[in-house]
Amino acid sequence: MDKNMQGKIVKGIFGFYYVHVAGSGIYECKAKGIFRNQKIKPLVGDNVTIAVLDEEQMLGNIEEILPRENALIRPAVANIDQALVIFAAAKPKPNFNLLDRFLIMMEYQKVPVTICFNKCDLLTGEELHAFSDVYEQCGYPVVYTSAREQRGIDALLERLDGKVTSVAGPSGVGKSSLINCLQPERQMETGAISRKIERGRHTTRHSEIIPIKEQTYIMDTPGFSTLDIPGLEKEDLWWYYPEFEEYEPNCRFKGCSHIGEPSCGVKEAVEAGKISRLRYENYMQLYQELKEQKKY
């Protein structure tokens, strides 16, 4: 008789789903045909019930997908508590336009975000705060780490504790090194999971979850570069720049785009140094992109 267990999908590739069962390890599973018939696709992050088919080989079938807390469009994952976006403080110089895109994608999907600046050992404290203050003033938590010097790791672990965190960032920022710092070597199960799902052989093309400790997971997600959010209208973009809200009532025109109109409270705040000019320039570029998307 098949034995049923509950676990979490930590990776899905080529129709196989790797399910982490706490205390038992990783089971390689296939989804039952009923999901396909109902047009339901299991997602990385799903909590599932599996029927164990072969205990020795650790094979099973996914019998049930438990109710989802949430499901993101991009990346296509489920049951995320928060997101962590990692950028290098230097080498490479942070691309703030890319950072803003990620923040908007997560805000749109109602996922709280923490910003992590890695390689903080390459800059002075004053240099770090010059750009991190911009985001802290917008309400985003910011943490500083150095994977090379093992700095800030405990503070980062505190933010991750007990949560499922989607981790993203452009290449070259030390994301893999930082993820390795978060996995204590004494946890043999984590090492076994890495071997089972062949972690580290490829760049991140598929989302996968890495257990850090009990009830604490990080989800390594593929890179991001475009603002591809179905349903986001250019007129709504300013809502995702929280620092605009205070000055929007000062605009002369209702529905002001904060770009070409005269007597715009947001533009006046930029000129007065109350809103970051860098953030405002990113806003204008993203607004134009959304405008162009509508043409096609």
Segments predicted by a language model, with ranges:
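Helix-rich effector regions associated with P-loop NTPase G domains
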Residues: 3, 15, 33, 39-56, ...
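SH3/SH3-like beta-barrel fold
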Residues: 17-21, 29, 50
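Short, structured beta-strand/loop micro-motifs enriched in basic residues and often containing a Trp
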Residues: 24-34
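Conserved hydrophobic positions within beta-strands
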Residues: 7-9, 62
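Charged, amphipathic alpha-helical linker segments immediately N-terminal to NTP-binding catalytic cores
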Residues: 96-144, 282-285, 289
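Conserved Switch II/interswitch segment of TRAFAC-class P-loop GTPases
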Residues: 55-71, 81-98, 114, 121-125
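Canonical P-loop GTPase G-domain recognition
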Residues: 122-173
